[in-house]
Amino acid sequence: VGSEMCIRDSAYVWRVNVGRISLYLLDTDNEMNSEFDRSITHQLYGGDWENRLKQEILLGIGGILTLKKLGIKKDIYHCNEGHAALINVQRICDYVAEGLTYDQAIELVRASSLYTVHTPVPAGHDYFDEGLFGKYMGGYPSRMGISWDDLMDLGRNNPGDKGERFCMSVFACNTSQEVNGVSWLHGKVSQEMFASIWKGYFPEESHVGYVTNGVHFPTWSATEWKHLYAAHFDENFLYDQSNPKIWEAIYNVSDEEIWKTRMVMKNKLIDYVRKQYRETWLKNQGDPSRIVSLLDKINPNALLIGFGRRFATYKRAHLLFTDLDRLAKIVNNPDYPVQFLFTGKAHPHDGAGQGLIKRIIEISRRPEFLGKIIFLENYDMQLARRLVSGVDIWLNTPTRPLEASGTSGEKALMNGVVNFSVLDGWWLEGYREGAGWALTEKRTYQNQEHQDQLDAATIYSILEQEILPLFYARNKKGYSEGWVKTIKNSIAQIAPHYTMKRQLDDYYDKFYIKEAKRFKMLAADGCAKAKEIAAWKEEVAEKWDSIEVVSCEKTEDLVKGSIESGKEYTITYVIDEKGLNDAIGLELVTTYTAQDGKQHVYSVEPFNVVKKEGNLYTFQAKHKMENAGSFKVSYPVSYTHLRAHETRHDL
């Protein structure tokens, strides 16, 4: 597939069959390219910013060209991360080549595009200098039917600001009708993060929504657990995985069977750990007496806590090691033995993450932690599977609210592993009392070091006072009935809500169906509706500044800014629409000042059109404040086109 850039590159297209789904991979390592360009796809995120831009051009523009070559044309295009945002450049070019104007093409592209943002961390949002971006994208504006400045402005928070770089995430927002985060909290964070794109609106008014991530049950549930579920759950379980009623059957499974399954998986993990540690130690020519001592100390009857993930600094893998004296006391308690398994990798350019791994390894080799703190090398999917199915507790300690979703804990709970996490990402929604443990989502200190110290102390206290006593409250059969109850609660009350099936159902119901209907309407009859809306917007833009507020009537209390709660007030505006014919709407927006000092939306109420006389429209709203307090009120005017748009915004 050749992509028309300033430098023409070619890519092999490889197809991987993932179940019944075809995954297409683009590969520039072929003899048709220069030696330099053959390396574009050698490493994910590899090279400098220029190579990063090449990768994103290949993924976005090359991806659409690949689908065209393969004869694949779909109604909806789902852009995961801003890295793929340039799909909409090529899609606009294709529509313009078919005879549409840019304004008509962007209506079709927006209506059929969904952008999912996966992280609030700045490293996940790429910005490119105008010079570098123009080197490879300079030929595209003419094909899109716009100017170079117009293209750059689509990627800027502040259109017209020549000093602002092109942001892929902003471009994705500006060319997608729907945008979503990957958990409820991340959706809220994303509304704040992207608020500057849609000026004049509060973040809460944004159309940015959410779909909380789930995990693929057949992939991440161990065979032993699949057999248990198959034996006790409804026969249609796999086809109805997100049905909570089916999962409640876990309460009918005997405690002995639950505990036996957990111990089988735990022993498999410990055998794997011993084997890997022995091989790694011998490879590194370590002291044989130390490896023997370490392996002897791994106790299958001890509480086993796992921590495995990418070692980004916001994941706070260091948190457990804040107070080493207290940690040593916990892991060396002869009555309540506990062991920690750590594994993960840091980004090649993340020196802080690599340093953190080094520190954990150094701590694990200290005499008081030998065999109690274990770091496993070569983190991969196989090790991840063993870890999320073999430990007793899955620990997650991100800095709030930087964990967009997280999925490792979801994988663990499918295997009867109990979560202990900060209330961030998916766990903010998933946590149920009696089905796991949580650190509060509220910050106590603005100083991150102080917050880390508090969170670490909380982890130690919950371990000492709640988790360890419950785990070791063993009956005559050798297990804790309270612990098994916690496992059952976790599976019954949380697991059904975090399957991939539920996630896909949410995307289908919230976005795919809505966009498919919208796109079908706009594309029908030679794109007649898209052309109509584009023409309507052009007319509104020409006359917008001439719209005039003729009069405003409010009660005296409203004018003074002091109103009585529970009492209804009437506000009336007369507006001259200057011949736009039902083009505008008026709303009453009430806001309050939160503890963070920011204004937040309390309510949004539409005005009703109660009278029309030529171009004069009389808008009226009846307003009643039910609660006392200090509020601000505004009356924003917006334009509407109800026949084509289901959202308040012109996006």
Task: Please identify what each model-predicted range represents.
Residues 1-4, 8-643, 648:
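Catalytic cores of carbohydrate-active enzymes across secretory and cytosolic contexts
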